[in-house]
Amino acid sequence: MALLQISEPGMAPAPHQRRLAVGIDLGTTNSLVAAVRNSVPEVLPDEAGRVLLPSVVRYLEKGGRRIGHEAKEQAATDPRNTIVSVKRFMGRGKAEVEGAANAPYEFVDAPGMVQIRTIDGVKSPVEVSAEILATLRYRAEDSLGDDLVGAVITVPAYFDEAQRQATKDAARLAGLNVLRLLNEPTAAAIAYGLDNGSEGLYAVYDLGGGTFDLSILKLTKGVFEVLAAGGDSALGGDDFDHALFGHVLAQAGIDVKTLAPEDVRLLLDRVRVLKEALSSAPQASLDVTLSGGAHLVQTISHDTFASLVEPLVQRTLTPTRKALRDAQVTSADIKGVVLVGGATRMPVIRDAVAKYFGQPPLVNLDPDQVVALGAAIQADLLAGNRGTGDDWLLLDVIPLSLGVETMGGLVEKIIPRNSTIPIARAQEFTTFKDGQTAMAIHVVQGERELVADCRSLARFELRGIPPMTAGAARIRVTYQVDADGLLSVFAREQLSGVEASVVVKPSYGLADDDIAKMLEDSFKTAEIDMRARALREAQVEAERMLEATQAALAADGELLDADERTQVDTLAAALRAVAQGDDTNAIEAATKALAEGTDEFAARRMDKSIKRALSGRRLDEI
């Protein structure tokens, strides 16, 4: 008789049967894949022993393609068909990347996410990223000798809903089961925390090729709690390359518009080598011949480079200050600063971090590999390979508040920013007008008080609400954010049970006003926003009062004598006169006057309703 194998949920049936899962760092410049072997996380190399896979894809005629090192070598000779730094285009519309610095690509005007025309047809960033992910998947399966049950893929903490969804789509296209989308700084903290048994407050400074993240984490007895996250989703090592690129052209008196695409790519590649050389030498030289025969020879000192990129360095410190403020800590409270991303190898970055935090940063793990290692540890745990000492908890956060539009274009925040995920929050709303049978629900993201100043994520309608007087219906709206940071919204009318929901998958074409800028604007305009909100709330209440009064007069106007009717009409006219103005106090005073002036009328209506309800009924029936 066959025996059933019974094991704990999510655990392997036998201790020696490990379920293979990997951590993937899908980077702007380079990507890596790592796995846990013999309880130790390690980065998996290719057949040549290289662990870094350049995030570059070159498309050839008739469906051919080259990925990684081979594609990177051809970037200068075939720039239009060789896609580099594709992560910067993930989840973005054409309007957002049209001005991408010195990009040699032909962007296609199509709805949704930006498309790039190549010799093999039009490609989306999702397709390009899928090629990179598939290459890493094959590397892992060859190295581990079996199929994967899934992968943890890291994303910048400041990736928005569209960018996260695009990353999951790319993984699915590559044949990968996504166990979790993990924020890059959190992955780095896992690698450091589990490796060193650290406890206390830590800052993770993550400067990659195209994005910057700063997270404040609290490590306590196996609990990884993200207290706050900040960053800039459009700032990375590429921007340092472009600053140096612009300086080289200016010194040579060359206008970038006169350069052929292959020369732009060649110069950018040489400038990147120059930047890397300046990380370990006081000066470095550039010697390059362009396609037209022009020969450029320049020597640049480290001091010159440092002055060129100082504005970029300062841009990383602005989100750093905000994250510390959000976490309600100071730089002096930070026990250690973890550096993540190849761009943090630059001395200008390490010096700036050391000066700001008053201590040298932690660099005992390779900044290029630490994110992949942390992701591998999380993947191994999620695959069910729990071992001794693996009892730890990860608490991540969302970067921006999630809210719903209410009457008057106001935002009611349901889940505030820096809330720990996964999370679900619910709030009850009601109807504004008598007999209202439907409600439009508008989901927004941002810190401002007015809908017009926030990002629209989704809209849906709840229909079938039973007709009732205004304010009688009870609609419960629930926001649910999963561990990947993706949002679902549910609405339910409590009496009838009708419900509607939406999984938020925002249009890839939405303009990203830069999440960091949204936060900055919210701080600068907080007082103005609150005044505007108070005004709109007063106007909405005035409108509700006027509509209710008008409906009452139409139904029971005979309960008032001529003088009383004149008084109510006068108060209503006074409120109507100020309701659309900008004097909040005047609107509130006029609303209060009308409410008090109709108190007796309301009492008479109540008496009439009671008499009508009791008419013709015996005492024992009541």
Curated annotation (Swiss-Prot):
GO molecular function, one term: ATP binding
Assigned keywords, A-Z: ATP-binding, Chaperone, Nucleotide-binding
GO biological process: iron-sulfur cluster assembly
Classification via Pfam families: HSP70
Keyword Lipid metabolism: no
Matches recorded under Gene3D superfamilies: 1.20.1270.10, 3.30.420.40, Actin, Chain A, domain 4, Substrate Binding Domain Of DNAk, Chain A, domain 1
CDD domains: ASKHA_NBD_HSP70_HscA
Function: Chaperone involved in the maturation of iron-sulfur cluster-containing proteins. Has a low intrinsic ATPase activity which is markedly stimulated by HscB.
Family from the record: Belongs to the heat shock protein 70 family.
Protein name from the UniProt record: Chaperone protein HscA homolog
